[in-house]
Amino acid sequence: MMSHQQVQMDLILMQGIWTSVLKMQNYSTLLQLGSSSSMPQRPRLLSRVSQRGRLTLNLESGRWRLSIIIFLETGTTQLVTTILPSTDYLGI
C-alpha cells in the first residue's frame, strides 16, 4: 500500500484486471489499470509527484507505464497509459 498525506493506494487483482484502490479522505474509488493477461506483472510504484493541487502516481509493469493523476480538491482521477514498443527483433 502506498500512502500520501491525503491519498492511500492499494493494487488488487479483481476478476483478472489490475485495479487501483484509491482512498481519499471520506471516500474510495476503484480505477481499472489493465488486464492481467496483457500486464502479467503486478504494477509497481515508480514515483509520486505532488504539485499545485494534484498528485501524480507513476507505475510500471513490464512495457506498461501508467500515470494516475489525482486532483486533490475534487478527488477527480485521470489515467494515462503508455505501452513501450517491443524490443524483440523478428529479423524478417
Swiss-Prot record:
InterPro entries: Bunya_NSs. The lineage of its organism: Viruses, Riboviria, Orthornavirae, Negarnaviricota, Polyploviricotina. One of its GO terms (biological process) is symbiont-mediated suppression of host gene expression. Belongs to the orthobunyaviruses NS-S protein family. Keywords: Eukaryotic host gene expression shutoff by virus, Eukaryotic host transcription shutoff by virus, Host gene expression shutoff by virus, Host-virus interaction, Inhibition of eukaryotic host transcription initiation by virus. It comes from Bunyavirus La Crosse (isolate Human/United States/L78/1978). Inhibits host transcriptional machinery, by producing modifications to the phosphorylation state of the C-terminal domain (CTD) of RNA polymerase II. Inhibits phosphorylation at serine 2 in the heptapeptide repeat (YSPTSPS) of the CTD of RNA polymerase II, suggesting that the elongation step of transcription and/or 3'-end processing is prevented. Inhibition of host transcription machinery leads to shut off of host cell protein synthesis and inhibition of the host innate immune response. NSs also seems to be involved in the nuclear relocalization of host PABP1. This is Non-structural protein NS-S.
